[in-house]
Design a protein with these regions (language model features):
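A generic structural signal for short
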Residues: 6, 43-44, 78-79
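Alpha-helix initiation and capping sites
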Residues: 8, 12, 45-49, 87
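Active-site-proximal loop/turn and secondary-structure-junction residues that shape catalytic pockets
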Residues: 7, 36, 72-74
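A structural preference for short, hydrophobic beta-strand core positions in alpha/beta folds
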Residues: 3-5, 68
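Conserved H-loop
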Residues: 64, 68-71
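Helical hairpin unit composed of two closely spaced alpha helices linked by a short loop
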Residues: 27-64
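C-terminal regions of RecA-like/P-loop NTPase motor modules
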Residues: 2, 11-30, 54, 60-62, ...
């Protein structure tokens, strides 16, 4: 695992760094936090799309995985209802992405509004457990774009102390008179 600080970069420099590691270290996975425009185009949303296109082309041409994070805007959108409109950056970047997953925490006071199932169509659902440990949190993951198929709404439990993510199942809003069961 290599960590490289390339905070201030041009698109050419970013491409060069990735390709150097690809050829020298045989990397297959790149995680880029946080996707941003090159240093000469800060604040220009269309330039962000160019950066994303460069990364997408590298991934396709060299058979590697490139994942990145994007910031969400500060909105009051319910975690299960996130969409591309909640992104802080240009929404046009979605056009070049193969997959877009939007994550947002579910606040403890709202846990009772949600339930989850192990399979998307299951009728048996489970409650979200409240934890005393503040490092344990739930996140909604809305798959906004997926060229490979389905676009589910997923539930993850995160333990910040151990940086452990666990996919629990398919998230849904509670229904009136819904059948619930208690998970062992």
């Amino acid at each position: 695992i290599y960590f490289i600080d390339i905070t201030d970069h041009t698109n050419d420099e970013l491409k060069k760094v990735i390709m150097n590691y690809y050829y020298k270290e045989k990397i297959e996975y790149v995680f880029y936090d946080t996707l941003k425009t090159d240093i000469d185009n800060i604040g220009n949303g269309e330039e962000l799309k160019k950066t994303a296109t460069i990364l997408s082309n590298l991934a396709q041409n060299f058979d590697m995985y490139i994942g990145s994070t994007l910031q969400l805007a500060e909105t009051s959108t319910d975690p299960i209802n996130l969409s591309v409109n909640d992104m802080a950056v240009s929404r046009t970047v979605k056009e070049v992405l193969d997959t877009l997953c939007l994550f947002k925490p579910i606040h403890t006071e709202n846990l009772g509004n949600y339930q989850y199932s192990l399979n998307e169509t299951d009728e048996e659902v489970y409650e979200l457990e409240k934890f005393k440990d503040p490092d344990v949190r739930y996140y909604s993951c809305v798959v906004d774009k997926n060229r490979a198929g389905a676009k589910p709404k997923l539930l993850f439990r995160l333990n910040l102390a151990y940086n452990r993510w666990e996919e629990l199942g398919y998230l849904r809003l509670k229904q009136q008179n819904a059948h619930t069961s208690i998970k062992d």
